[in-house]
């Protein structure tokens, strides 16, 4: 009986030690919390400012992450073998990537921390870095990390790297090679890592949307049908305009970048009203905000009302930026994608 009690006591102590926060992680968390607290306090000053001058003043005092990046990196380097150092590497790689410490942390993802747990978000963020830098790191994590979230993130990010290579390819052979590699990685995410999420978003869902884009939204593909209603509830379809060149614009009143493009689109709609060219929008505001945007920017082309940036139409097109412009040929095939007004005008001879 006594030996059983001793055994149970040992197990309890072990559990308590295991549950105790890692000292390195706690030290890093304290630095991050201090920085984030100061940022929040400054943000509240901007929100509560009574005049534009006050807002400008407080915008000029937004705390820099530089000092905190230096502190976090020192803790990481002093405790490289501590599991809690992964938090510092993740934060530096995602929140301080523009500083030297952030660049060092990116390399750590593929070296000292390639087997660490808790770095999945930082690994996924490598999809946005140049492939020459990111690919060796992603492959190191994919091959050596024993944790499913990290392996899934590396596989997904590799898929996105090759997806972007495909989008940027200027010759058919390079495009097909990149497309094949992207599909291979995305299919692995869908089949092997179907349950993995990062920041609450299932990677398999993101991979599925991008595979759909590769298969159905590439230049030369026939654009999927769009069937919806405008803000007043009148229904119409993309196929109603077959026989005309169609410019698609995904936009919203909430989108500051759209504000400068909308007047140009209005001018283009006016200039082409007697030609076999039509501009159709996909608006991503809630109905009341959509009506306000139509008035504020005097929008003179018809738009489907999608309700949000994750509405049914927008989701199909797997958008990453706003505004997004497409040009479709009269037969419905995509001729330009993620393009700009100047390229559209040149293609149409305007």
Say what each PLM segment does.
Residues 75-85, 95-119, 125-132, 141-152, ...:
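Short solvent-exposed coil/turn linkers within tandem alpha-helical repeat scaffolds
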Residues 176-229, 239-242, 288, 292:
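N-proximal helix/coil linker or "cap" segments that precede and/or mark the start of modular domains
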Residues 242, 250-267:
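Conserved redox-active cysteine motifs that mediate thiol-disulfide chemistry
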Residues 244-246, 251-254, 286, 321:
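Short pre-active-site segment immediately N-terminal to redox-active cysteine/selenocysteine motifs
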Residues 259-298, 305-315:
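Structural microenvironment flanking redox-active thiols in thiol-disulfide oxidoreductases
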Residues 295-300, 305-349:
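Thiol/disulfide oxidoreductase modules built on the thioredoxin-like
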């Amino acid at each position: 009986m006594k030996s059983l009690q001793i055994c149970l006591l040992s197990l309890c102590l072990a559990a308590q030690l295991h549950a105790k926060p890692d000292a390195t992680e706690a030290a890093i968390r304290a630095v991050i919390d201090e920085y984030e607290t100061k940022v929040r306090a400054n943000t509240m000053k901007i929100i509560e400012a009574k005049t534009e001058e006050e807002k400008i003043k407080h915008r000029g005092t937004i705390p820099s992450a530089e000092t905190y990046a230096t502190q976090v990196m020192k803790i990481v380097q002093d405790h490289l073998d501590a599991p809690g150092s992964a938090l510092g590497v993740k934060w530096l790689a995602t929140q301080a990537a523009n500083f030297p410490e952030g660049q060092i942390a990116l390399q750590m993802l593929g070296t000292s921390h390639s087997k660490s747990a808790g770095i999945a978000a930082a690994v996924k963020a490598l999809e946005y870095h140049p492939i020459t830098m990111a690919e060796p790191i992603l492959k190191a994590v994919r091959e050596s990390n024993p944790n499913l979230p990290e392996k899934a993130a590396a596989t997904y990010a590799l898929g996105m790297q090759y997806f972007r290579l495909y989008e940027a390819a200027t010759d058919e052979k390079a495009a097909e090679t990149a497309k094949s590699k992207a599909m291979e990685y995305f299919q692995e995410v869908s089949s092997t890592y179907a349950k993995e999420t990062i920041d609450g978003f299932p990677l398999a869902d993101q991979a599925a949307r991008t595979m759909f884009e590769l298969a159905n939204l590439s230049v030369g593909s026939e654009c999927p049908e769009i069937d919806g209603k405008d803000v007043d509830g009148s229904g119409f379809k993309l196929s109603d305009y077959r026989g005309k060149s169609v410019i698609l614009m995904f936009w919203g009143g909430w989108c500051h970048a759209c504000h400068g493009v909308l007047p140009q689109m209005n001018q283009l709609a006016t200039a082409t009203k007697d030609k076999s060219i039509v501009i159709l929008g996909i608006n991503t505001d809630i109905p009341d905000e959509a009506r306000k945007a139509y008035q504020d920017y005097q929008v003179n082309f018809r738009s489907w009302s999608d309700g949000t940036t994750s509405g049914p139409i927008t989701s199909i097109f797997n958008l990453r930026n706003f505004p997004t412009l497409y040009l479709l040929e009269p037969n419905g095939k995509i001729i330009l994608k993620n393009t700009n007004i100047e390229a559209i005008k040149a293609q149409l001879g305007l």
